[in-house]
Amino acid sequence: MSEPMKVVIVGGVAAGPKAASKIIRLMPDADVTIVEKGRFLSYAGCGLPYYISGVVKEQKELMATPVGVVRDPVFFQNVKNVHVMNETEALEIDRASKCVRVREVVGSKESRLDYDKLVLATGASPFVPPIPKVDLNNIFSLHGVQDAEGIKAVLAEGKAQDVVIVGGGLIGVEVTEALVQRGCRVTMVEMLPQMLGILDWEIAKLVEQYMESHGVKVLTNTKVESFEGDGKVKAVVTGKVSLPADMVILAIGVRPNVQLAQVAGLEIGPTGAIKVDEHMRTSDPEIYAAGDCVESVDLLTGHPCYVPLGSTANKQGRVAAVNVCGGNECFPGVLGSTVCKVFDYCVARTGLTETAAREAGYEVVTALAPAPDIAHYMPEAKPLLLKLVADKASRRLLGAQAIGPGSGDKRIDVAAMAITAGLTLDQLANADLCYAPPYSPAMDNIITAANVARNKLDGHMVGVAPMEVCRMLEEKRNFVFLDVRSPAEYEEVRLPGSTLIPLGTLRGRLGELPSSKEIITFCKISLRGYEASLILKAAGFKKVRVMDGGVAMWPYEKLFPS
């Protein structure tokens, strides 16, 4: 009788436990050991902001099964038949002898673990910038359970009134909401021109405006130069201003933990993460890697990319496990599909942004399509703004972004599947999606957005981005900015430089418009703007464009006459 396969897994948070569980399901007699440097196992790191806010009441909920059983070493031993060595650090891989040298964090006792197959799930660590006095008390990163406990302890003292978030990415945005809910005054500082660099500028700007409406101060193009304080942080000094701070959260992203692999001579990819093939094998065929320590492949460009997400880590852990057990499963790559809760808004994206698509060499067409997320006459209807990016030549969908209180995740999931399948806008526009008034408009938002892009490609509509219109206004270009909304809407909010002719009166007032000038039409969402452009073209006007997305997608200052 052959000896059980020995599998050592380094890392016990996401990809590691997933791999261990799948290996035991496929090969019940396998000898599986998880080595985890920290105390806690298999916890939901993405849930930490909600633990800080109090939405998640107890720490154990983050590491429990759906029926409330905590996934601790006893659980893994009794339920999974997996041996766990937590609070134990993997020090060195001896590839020739196929063993891992480990040391207990408390007590420093060392031992050696032999393996037939090794899985590296070493994760990532928060990036801590080399800023003067970054080691002051009350300066935190948010990566693990202990970080969250430290933040909660400061909040419990009731003295963290002013909090500065350094970094405007996903972690920064999510923890900002948690801190506002705890009564803090929050300032977000982002070095780049926009927060949420995974979005196009105009979508990120709408997120910024929405956060500011909830009392958050957002400073972009602002670099932190130092921290001030005697023992505890008291201020954050930027190149523009000094900000009072009782607490600071560093949310500048993570870096893959690759030192163990690198010292062992495993290949590191161009992103700085461990290079793996589609089977999650490293450059050593006996060693697999998965999760935040590895790089992936962008499904659209084919280039290596680093997109650390818990969802990806679990999928990769499963693929690695199947192949450890002799299977032939592949992980094809990622689209960077992401969703984020920002107060009452859903912000989501997948695939390439317009900027990334152009940088990748695509000639693109875009669609901005705001609309209610369900039938407009239903009382539960909420606004949702969609942006689609497609390739002009092939008409294939390349990317999608969503923002608003409506169900954006649903539409972005559809977009992710459409991109993965290589669907064109024409195929997406005729997709047989579910419809009932409480759940969707008759023409779903993503179908409408696809049709907007198709209208552009087919010559029925010429669009112009709000950013370009803003530049034209600033440069005092000679054009007519035609608002075709109702007088009541115009009195409620208007855009600078606009002229009002309601759509219902346009046919009778064509003589008021100069045929020699360009006319850019718009309304609340530019559906009426599109109708107006068709009326103008039919009347012989040659220079007519529609502002994409209308007032709803205008990311600049608006006028409120009332």
Describe each region flagged by the PLM:
Residues L120-R182, K217, V276-E278, T499-R509:
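Glycine-rich dinucleotide-binding loop and its adjacent helix/turn
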Residues D135-K159, E228-A235, G239-V322, V414, ...:
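FAD-site-proximal beta/loop scaffold in flavoenzymes
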Residues A14-A15, I171, R528:
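Hydrophobic/small residue at the entry helix of a nucleotide-binding pocket
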